[in-house]
């Protein structure tokens, strides 16, 4: 960012006590990355690498591939119990390891390994929840916008954008109309943690565009909205389609659940019987 646009943003931030400089904005750059991926039911699922949370969805799918969801009621307590336990295991790893890889090693290969998936799947008890997992710290945000475009030549774009909280930081650069995000909330303040705040560092990021690939070609760019929910949403939609044969609309409309910080959040469409089954499992 340079010129009048950068000056407008820096002036606003400086007026609020920020130490931002024109050089900071001029040095801002995007980068090309190699997607990370796993295989689920014969399809490749591709995600953005850390600092994004896409790896969380892939860890979930690796766990669920060992459970055998296809024989379960897609709207039943057992299916959702397995999905939520896989999510809790995956988010626990996310909050311990996912960070800006340019500031330290993020063990992507280990997190996506068959060995780890086997170990995590073996921890799931079909009759009760795992007790010794960390509580998710993220608020559940609902203001993300996702879009996808495919042209006549099947070039595909999977795109997602968000200021994080509603109206981001609430700070507006008056001349340009730029509303600043508050993605710094994704950092932790624990010294020595891979995701501890530092100058020039990118925080753990929730927005994750994805693609399904078959025989080397993209067949479905996809994404969901909801902040921290997105990784669960990816795994849920893919499972709905590949385990249960739902079409895209059915997969999106199907009842959802999320292991929130205080309790399990479940969609209104989930039956009383399924809810009671989840309560019985803890």
Mark where each language-model region is.
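Internal maturation/activation junctions in enzymes
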Residues: 6, 66-163, 175-176, 183
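Active-site rim segments in enzyme catalytic domains, especially the processed small/beta chain
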Residues: 19-21, 155-220, 244, 248
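Accessory "access/gating" subregions that flank catalytic or transport cores
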Residues: 1-50, 110-111, 121-139, 147-151
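Glycine-rich phosphate/pyrophosphate-binding beta-alpha loops
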Residues: 46-54, 144-148, 158-171, 224-230
């Amino acid at each position: 960012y340079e010129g009048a646009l950068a000056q407008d943003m820096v002036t606003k931030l400086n007026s609020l006590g920020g130490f931002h400089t024109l050089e900071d904005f001029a040095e801002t750059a995007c980068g090309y990355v190699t997607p990370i991926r796993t295989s689920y039911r014969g399809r490749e699922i591709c995600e953005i690498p850390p600092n994004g949370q896409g790896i969380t969805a892939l860890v979930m799918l690796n766990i669920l591939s060992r459970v055998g969801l296809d024989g379960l009621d897609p709207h039943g307590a057992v299916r959702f119990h397995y999905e939520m336990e896989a999510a809790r295991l995956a988010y626990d790893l996310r909050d311990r390891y996912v960070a800006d890889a340019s500031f330290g090693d993020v063990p992507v290969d280990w997190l996506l390994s068959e060995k780890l998936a086997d170990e995590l799947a073996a921890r799931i008890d079909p009759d009760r929840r795992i007790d010794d997992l960390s509580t998710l710290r993220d608020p559940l945000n609902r203001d993300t916008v996702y879009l996808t475009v495919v042209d006549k030549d099947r070039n595909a774009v999977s795109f997602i954008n968000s200021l994080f909280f509603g109206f981001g930081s609430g700070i507006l650069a008056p001349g340009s109309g730029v509303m600043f995000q508050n993605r710094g909330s994704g950092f932790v303040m624990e010294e020595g943690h891979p995701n501890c705040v530092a100058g020039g560092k990118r925080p753990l990021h929730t927005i994750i565009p994805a693609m399904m690939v078959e025989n080397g070609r993209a067949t479905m760019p996809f994404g969901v909205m909801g902040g921290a929910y997105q990784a669960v949403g990816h795994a849920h939609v893919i499972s709905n389609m590949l385990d249960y044969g739902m079409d895209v609309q059915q997969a999106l409309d199907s009842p959802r659940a999320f292991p929130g910080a205080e309790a399990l959040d479940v969609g209104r469409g989930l039956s009383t019987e399924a809810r009671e089954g989840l309560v019985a499992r803890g």
